[in-house]
Amino acid sequence: MSANYIEVQIFGQVLRLHCPAEQQENLRASAQRLEERVALLKDQSGIIQLEKVLAIVALNLNYELEQEKQKNADNKTVLESCIHQLDSSLNKLATTGSIAINQENI
């Protein structure tokens, strides 16, 4: 098999996928996690139709992705605010030689 392709087995089917060598381990782990999530949902819900289970798992994964995107956006906003405060304090220090420390943010 070419170094740019990987075979993974998902739900009893072998898929041959293009994948850079440095990402193959992550792809295998992702396939394993997908199988685990599908099996768990089947057990919990009693749904046996693979297409329905896959659709629900896909929706759940997308929801989780959107939550993580929002967390990242929130973290970015907080970090940008901290950078702005630090920049302002450094500018004030360079100009006046002293700064007042806001104890609430420490």
Curated annotation (Swiss-Prot):
Q: Quick check: keyword Nucleotide-binding in the entry?
A: no
* Coiled-coil features, chain-numbered ranges: 21-80
Q: Which compartment or compartments is the protein found in?
A: Cytoplasm
InterPro entries noted in UniProt: Cell_div_ZapA-like, Cell_div_ZapA-like_sf, Cell_div_ZapA_N
Q: Give the main localization category.
A: cytoplasm
Family note = Belongs to the ZapA family. Type 1 subfamily.
How does this chain assemble?
Homodimer. Interacts with FtsZ.
Q: What PANTHER family does this protein map onto?
A: CELL DIVISION PROTEIN ZAPA
Role noted for this protein:
Activator of cell division through the inhibition of FtsZ GTPase activity, therefore promoting FtsZ assembly into bundles of protofilaments necessary for the formation of the division Z ring. It is recruited early at mid-cell but it is not essential for cell division.
User: Protein name, please?
Assistant: Cell division protein ZapA
Q: From which organism does this entry originate?
A: Haemophilus ducreyi (strain 35000HP / ATCC 700724)
